[in-house]
Amino acid sequence: MIFMILGRSKEFILKLPIWTQIITYIAILVYALSFFGISTGVLSLSWIGLLQKRQLYEIITYVTLHLSMLHIVFNFVSLLPAMSQFEKKQGTLACILVTVIPYTLFPGIMHLIVYHFFLRKDYVSIAGLSGWAFAFISASCVHSPQRLISFFNLFSIPAYCFPIIYLIMTTILVPKASFIGHASGAVMGYCTPFMLGSIPLKSWAQNVDPIFQSWVKNYHSFDQLSHAQLPIAEPLSTFSSFPGKGTRLGG
């Protein structure tokens, strides 16, 4: 049974677009390292770590760290469908740009600001990919804002409201969920069309895509038609009923 699950999981991951696939493997590797006595907590993001200890890598690495099997599984269930759909439609380059810069930096910076200047808790850390999950889900909802989404088959809501309802329910139902990280991710998702529209993505892709598309499997090139319909060309049919824990370390 276990080998069958592992086999199907491997098959699923290998079919993902390359950047989504890379992020998946990195998160799994980081989680696996903890079983060998390697301290991975240093990858989390906190004011003390980043600014007092000058561990600058934290502003990027915190998204790769998860605290439990449930944490990483729930985040994968929420993130991978939305992220892979985005990468297929907008291209690998666009997906890399939004994840490395706004989807990672903005939630991290907001966490630092709120916990240092308002809550006075410099030791509280943030970790996990749930901020990305909210970002990609929000980005998908911007595409068809009036589209109705069934919420647990109980009632339907406009797509643009879904991330907000999702955020509220996660905050209430999930212990230690990072409201700041989730909300910041959702904001960046809503802003995705404006961010990609403000950069010369087409010209960048024309230079980069031919280099990688020929030898990198599952690399997706920029599609001008899809880009004109930002943030994705086709709406997601379903969303996960659980967005992931977004657990904060030390809180």
Curated annotation (Swiss-Prot):
One of its GO terms (molecular function) is serine-type endopeptidase activity. Residues 225-251 are annotated as: SHP box. Changing Y31A: Does not affect proteolytic cleavage of sre1. Its EC number is 3.4.21.105. Changing A186T: Abolishes proteolytic cleavage of sre1 and sre2 cleavage. GO terms for cellular component: Golgi apparatus; Golgi membrane. It catalyses: Cleaves type-1 transmembrane domains using a catalytic dyad composed of serine and histidine that are contributed by different transmembrane domains. Interacts (via C-terminal SHP box) with cdc48; the interaction is required for rbd2-mediated cleavage of sre1 and sre2. This is Rhomboid-type serine protease 2. The lineage of its organism: Eukaryota, Fungi, Dikarya, Ascomycota, Taphrinomycotina.
